[in-house]
Amino acid sequence: MKKTLSIHSVRKDLILGSRRLSNYWWATIIFIGALGFLLAGLSSYFQVDLLPFTNSTDLVFIPQGIVMTFYGSIGVFLSLFLWLTIIWNIGAGYNEFNKDKGIVKIFRLGFPGKNRKICLQFNIKEIKSIKIDIKEGLNPRREIYLCTKDKRVIPLTRVGQPLLLSEVEEQAAEIARFLDVVLEGA
């Protein structure tokens, strides 16, 4: 939740999707590495030097060339998947809390298809609390959840790099204060 648009009775938190610098970095690095493996494997098969900075024709096609071609193909498909998630901006959206209309709207973009746009809408009266879930350790998790009276728990924070503890606490407190509900800790 990076940007917040707030007018006295409407609060809108924008959620960053897959268009993060780290995703651009990994998609590019994986593509370059995979392309190198693929070209080295194909060079050993065709006995033509497709990589200008090395002599890949000395590789024996079976087993080294086949393995390099296989790993290169898998890497190219993985980087293609990463680039498509960046282009489609998977996970982007917003959390809108509207006191005038009495609704909470959670909107996210998914993969193309009939369910590309995911929109959850709740009446503010259905909201029981805002919950903070903090797990420290090797893989830390710091998330904010919207808890409804019918026991549903909906995540409000973005996926990816965990927010600072102070940011999570501050955002959760602001949302709970805005909605006039209880703030829970896990």
UniProtKB/Swiss-Prot annotation:
Keywords: Chloroplast, Membrane, Photosynthesis, Plastid, Thylakoid, Transmembrane, Transmembrane helix. The keyword Isomerase does not apply. It holds the Pfam family Ycf4. One of its GO terms (cellular component) is photosystem I. The chain crosses the membrane at residues 26-46, 66-86. InterPro entries: PSI_Ycf4_assembly (IPR003359). GO terms for biological process: photosynthesis. Its main location: plastid. It comes from the Eukaryota. It is found in: Plastid, Chloroplast thylakoid membrane. It is a multi-pass membrane protein. PANTHER family: PHOTOSYSTEM I ASSEMBLY PROTEIN YCF4, PTHR33288. Belongs to the Ycf4 family. Seems to be required for the assembly of the photosystem I complex. This is Photosystem I assembly protein Ycf4. The lineage of its organism: Eukaryota, Rhodophyta, Bangiophyceae, Bangiales, Bangiaceae.
